[in-house]
Amino acid sequence: KKLYLFPERLRCMFLHLWCLGLRASEVCTLKGNAYYQQGEDYWIQVYQVKMKNYKRIPIPQALYQIMKVYLKKHEIQPEEFIFKNSRGGACLYGTFRTQMIEACRENKIANGEYLFQSHDYRHTVATMFYDSHVSLQSIRDYLGHTYEEMTRQYIDYMPQRIAKANDEFFEMQGSSLASWLKKEEKDGE
């Protein structure tokens, strides 16, 4: 709700975490030629610092358009880092994290006590894919993991399964508290 209050650079960096579940290090090292359109699909090429490898993943059209405007507005060349440090190199994760925490505090996100954990968005995206019945292998490839075991650790499936089981239980005839109260009222008459 308050993202529009953040500096433009932080907004764009955050959108890559939130929309795509990229690692913060991947966002910090994006270059001007990272975005492209192929037919009707939009893509990003990301250098995975941790894996020392490139990956290509689909992105929402809206993010593609936002970033094309950002690149043009800031005259970022294809081989330049998009989010630069003061010397023109890649933005450091520590700087990004500090700036995000400060922006969250200034804008009273969670009463100024929000703890920015960039990696949590990777878990959220993985869980969203899993809940949408995307195969574990596809999620692994999307996240850039080598092994499925690592991907399994990213899927926060237990809370959703517990919530679903809870909902199913209370939807059963006679299981809701309201039905018990009504039953007691009838028995008391």
Predicted regions and their residues:
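Alpha-helix N-cap/helix-start motif at helix boundaries, enriched for small hydrophobics
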Residues: 13, 25-30, 139
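Short alpha-helical segment immediately N-terminal to, or the first helix within
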Residues: 16-17, 128-129, 142
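Conserved tyrosine-mediated DNA breakage-rejoining catalytic core shared by Y-recombinases
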Residues: 20, 29-68, 149, 189
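Basic, Lys/Arg- and aromatic-enriched nucleic-acid-binding interface segment
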Residues: 1-24, 41, 122
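Short, basic (Lys/Arg/His-rich) helix/loop patches that form interaction surfaces
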Residues: 10, 20, 97-137
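Active-site/catalytic core of tyrosine-dependent DNA strand-transfer enzymes
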Residues: 60-113
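C-terminal secondary-structure termini that scaffold catalytic or DNA-interacting sites
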Residues: 87, 167-189
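Catalytic-site neighborhood detector that most strongly recognizes the C-terminal catalytic loop/helix
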Residues: 48-52, 143-171
